[in-house]
């Protein structure tokens, strides 16, 4: 049963995986009973997490078998809980682009959030639009989330600028991307078009670039002030390991002044 479970989690496309997540939630507590790792989002412990990723980025012990969080989801959740007033502020207007299924039920029930989701096509989103031309007025949102999107779009600077435009002055945003910390400069090559080649060069079949350590400069070009959050400077190594976070992952906090 465990082998079938693991195969499905790695073989199914993530959108379909998310739709079937209720099935995994039924079996996970029984199949992976234990306390070696912990997911702060679903607040459950397991004997281990599951492996996940493409052929290029396959990783062991990273996927929560209950709510399907990965390292980046757990990092963002812990940051919001520990380092911000996201869950306690009196009122925040939030725009969430390409909303992650693991966050949706939690954010939607927060009474302090005026929470709106958006996507190009996703049926679970409240609004549908192209990030290159956001049909919203200026300075509308206190907080914006847009994770693992900029590696897909034609013009990241245009999309970032549009998101910066709809943020209020004093607002902040998180826009995580796959980032190669060994690469100084973002890698783009318009001649790479086949899914197999894109996976090889950009880590996933539908990616069109691989961001390097210059990612903050892209964000600054779009008008953001960029602050760096390094979990290793704030949190204990034991809990970073227990939550199975990616130790080299940097979280960029974007401010609009």
Write out the residue ranges for each language-model feature.
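S-adenosyl-L-methionine-dependent methyltransferase catalytic module, highlighting the catalytic core
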Residues: 2-6, 24-37, 154-163, 168, ...
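Conserved N-terminal segment of class I S-adenosyl-L-methionine
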Residues: 2-135, 233-253, 257
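Local beta-strand N-terminus motif with an aromatic residue
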Residues: 91, 141-142
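Hydrophobic beta-strand segment of the Class I
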Residues: 97, 144-145
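PRPP/pyrophosphate-binding module of the type I phosphoribosyltransferase fold
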Residues: 145-147, 158
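Short catalytic micro-motifs in class I SAM-dependent methyltransferases
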Residues: 148-152
């Amino acid at each position: 049963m465990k082998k079938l479970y693991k195969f499905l989690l790695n073989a199914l496309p993530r959108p379909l995986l998310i739709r079937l997540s209720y099935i995994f939630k039924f079996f996970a507590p029984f199949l992976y009973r234990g306390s070696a790792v912990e997911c702060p989002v679903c607040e459950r412990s397991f004997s281990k997490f599951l492996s996940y990723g493409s052929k290029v980025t396959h990783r062991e012990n990273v996927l929560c078998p209950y709510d399907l969080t990965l390292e980046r989801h757990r990092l963002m959740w812990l940051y919001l809980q520990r380092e911000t007033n996201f869950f306690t502020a009196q009122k925040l207007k939030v725009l969430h682009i390409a909303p992650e299924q693991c966050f949706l039920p939690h954010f939607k029930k927060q009474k302090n959030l005026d929470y709106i989701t958006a996507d190009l096509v996703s049926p679970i989103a409240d609004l549908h639009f192209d990030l290159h031309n956001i049909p919203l007025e200026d300075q509308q949102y206190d907080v914006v989330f847009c994770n693992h999107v900029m590696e897909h779009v034609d013009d990241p600077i245009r999309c970032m600028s549009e998101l910066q435009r709809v943020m209020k002055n004093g607002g902040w945003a998180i826009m995580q991307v796959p980032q190669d910390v060994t690469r100084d400069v973002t890698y783009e090559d318009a001649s790479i078009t086949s899914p197999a080649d894109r996976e090889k060069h950009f880590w996933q079949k539908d990616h069109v670039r691989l961001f390097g350590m210059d990612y903050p400069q892209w964000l600054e070009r779009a008008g953001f002030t960029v602050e760096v959050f390094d979990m290793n400077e704030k949190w204990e190594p034991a809990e970073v390991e227990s939550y199975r976070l990616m130790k080299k992952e940097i979280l960029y906090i974007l401010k609009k002044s």
